[in-house]
Amino acid sequence: MLGGFSMARALVPAVLLLLPALALGQAAPEAKADSAPAAAAALDPGTAAKPAGPAAPAGVVDPRTWGTRETEWKSHRELAGHVFIPSFIIQEPFSQTSFGLKFGFGSGSATGPSLVWTGNPSDPLAPGPDKDYPFNALGFGVNVTARILEWLSARLLIGGDAYLGSGRDSILVIGTQVKAAADLGVMASFPVGEHFRLAAAFDVTYGPAFNVLVAEGIASAIRDGTANVDVLNRTSTFTWIPGLLGAWAPFPFLGATLNLQFVHPSTTETGTSSFSQNGWSLAGAVDFDLAPLVPAVPFGVIVAYKLLGPLGSTGVTRTDNLDFGLFYTGRKDLALGLEFDLRWFHIQSELASTGTTVLFTMRYYF
């Protein structure tokens, strides 16, 4: 027993001495394995593992993909996965912030009576058979819209257009007409389910118009026997426009928009009293976007129609617009395209006219 106890007492220190060695022996392969990348990094610093950067906060989109189809960022003009394509004759029922420009040029013809020289100083020009008078047209516009709340927005539109007679007879009859207008409006909108959105809008428009009436000026000069004749007719119009707007997106590639408005313009002519008119406006649009179906073809088309009709005995003059648009749809924050507008209207409220205009349209959404 004493011998066994002496042997155990001798083995305990030996075991205690072996434990650190065994621990070092097990750790050696791991250290050797871990040292391989370190050695490689020492030989080639480019292969060294780089520390991972901090993860992007939730909800933050890579700036390189802002507005593109690859992101989950939802545009304020998006409904049920469909990003609506704008048209200059349609008001969208979306609360959004955007800046837009449009510029267009075109031509057309107006139908009116021909001028017959009578030789009578009291009535030097008399109307003859109707004929067509060609004209050229120019137009521009700036659109600024601000999203105040999720359901409330305000907008400011500034624009103008001009019609110029083309040719000697057209210059005499049509002359030159220049119009400018500023539109200030507010809109309250709200979603109805997933596929619909409705809005109520109220706009106030003010704009002057200048008409250079060459034929009337010549007739007045002969009739009055004086060259001091004012050939410039000036008017100013103040218009109230309340309306209801709606949008429907049954599929991500298809959308429809509808506008119904009441129009009440009050016009003041130079040297005469004011007069008021009433009218109504109905406009609709259907747009088709290829991007959700074929991402390699980021283009869309829109077809829109707008009718301005008289209301009551003192109604406005009827105007029809038929609009076709081709737009780039690769970015949700950009609407860029060409619009072709066919318009039936009256120049100077007397000459029935038909005109075709090509417009360049750009709108950026923030």
Which sequence ranges carry the predicted segments?
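N-terminal signal peptide c-region/cleavage motif recognized by signal peptidases
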Residues: 20-22
